[in-house]
Amino acid sequence: MLKIDMWFKLKSLGFSLISLQALLASCSAVSPVPVPIEEKNDSTTDNNATPFKDEQSDQGTEVNQQPKVEQKVYNRNFKFNTSFIPEESDIYRKGYDLTFTLNFTSFSNDSYGTGWLIDWKGDENTTQKQGSFFAYIATNLHVADGLRNIGDHWPYSKTDDQREFNEYESTVYFSIGKYTNKTDITKLYQEEKLEQRKVNDSLLSIQTSNIPKTAYTATNFLKGVNSIKPVYADFAVIELELNLENLRDWQIFNEFIKPAINTYKSLGDSTNIFETKDLEQHWNHSHYLLGYPVLERGYDQNRLLEQKEEFARTHNFNQKSQLWSKNTYLVSTAKEIPVITKNARKDGQIGSEIFSKKTQDSHVDKVIKHEKGIVTFQNFKNFKLKYHDKEYQQYGYGLMLDDTNLPGGSSGSAIFNNNQKINSIYFGVLEVYKNSKTHKDNIGMSQLLRTSKRESEKNKTRTTNNRDKFQHYDLIFGDSNTKSFYAQFAKKHNTHLYDQIKSSEKEEFKYVDKNNQKTPFLLR
């Protein structure tokens, strides 16, 4: 009889990585969507399902009524805080301002993740409801896999083997949401000329007029990698084109994106918001993240939303406008919704600490190789996923966050350090057990976005289990080891981030302008 004394699983709901000792799945939430039996044309609405109807637009807004502020219990007595809007002085406020819940729907599944503003293109100060504004939202690669748009930027408009997305897997609906105060929600009701209702602070989710596109994926991002499979970091950026003449797109721009831009600039703007440190410098920091996992709503609460309605299945999938619309309201009995959530540590302190060896016989050390909570992903051959049907091996470096366990839907959350700089992106949780029964640790996992070149110099005089083959990389601005990075897209499309690169005097941000760097589209 085979007895496994110690084991762990790294879980989320987006993908699975399986070996004898580990199960990895990402913290995105995915639900199957039944294949529709009855087809409707694009003018059909279900008037019997709604107490009143929105005549203003064919895009939709969800308002999920507030559950009571409380401490939720998830997964073997792990606790976290939900349903809150941080005060201006709260260390979580910057993350709140930048962060959104994302919902991708196809005819085959309904998936949720978390994203945050990384860049934009257009006049953020405009008061004119005309033209387009582009917002760029960072998230996980496995969350971005839920976006399958036949009108996407090349090469993302097809699978890796150039197969076109079929109608069941193509994204037909997208919305972006945020936990919002009741004053702003009341204003939205007035703008929509809807029946006034008493509302609390609630999750507000708004459908965009266009299906998003893919700006960047961290696939095959490293030079000189010795790997059987192509490599990935769990990071991607999606592009939202907002038509400011459209009421709902204007609401997204005015209520979500503009406040996020103000916060982004207050944090130092593009060239000051992202941390790059030697690996051991992460050890002494606390790390702060909040996201939008999909959780069970309070039983005494209703969810007010606009109904997803299906257009005719013969609709032209090449057009960029959305194929589903939420254009009627109803009270839904949905038991789970995205809920703004932050970690609640067992010791009552805020923020997450790096996992470190607590005893010489730590059970964690026996099942996962790490150096004081710093992980080298290429040491784990089962850390892999499929993006658009192609399998990738995870590479790069990450943080193990002690006593951290946010459920599915939180994937893509930005992680801030003590200096209010973003150092990594959250993608899953490692649940460690002893004797296959007793829960021992909840360890959140994140992918570092930038690593210091100084590590390579240190590596010449030191060899450890995790750093004997260290390769620095920079997924945002690029460096000599990184062949695919976001700034390539920013340069090609002349976004705000590239404007900041041009105006910076620091060489570390200028790599995109050296050696005629290719765009990431050629490097998938």
Swiss-Prot record:
Topological relation to the membrane, as annotated: Lipid-anchor
Lipid-attached positions, S-diacylglycerol cysteine: C27
Keyword flag Cell membrane: yes
Polar residues bias locations: 58-68
Keyword check for Signal: yes
Signal peptide, first to last residue: 1-26
Keywords, alphabetical: Cell membrane, Lipoprotein, Membrane, Palmitate, Signal
InterPro entries: Mycoplasma_peptidase_DUF31, Peptidase_S1_PA, Uncharacterised_MG067
Lipid-binding residues (covalent, N-palmitoyl cysteine): C27
PROSITE patterns reported in the protein's UniProt record: PROKAR_LIPOPROTEIN
Subcellular location as annotated: Cell membrane
Disordered: region residues: 37-68
Gene Ontology CC annotation, any one: plasma membrane
Family statement drawn from the similarity comment of this UniProt entry: Belongs to the MG067/MG068/MG395 family.
The protein's name: Uncharacterized lipoprotein MG395
Organism for this UniProt entry: Mycoplasma genitalium (strain ATCC 33530 / DSM 19775 / NCTC 10195 / G37)
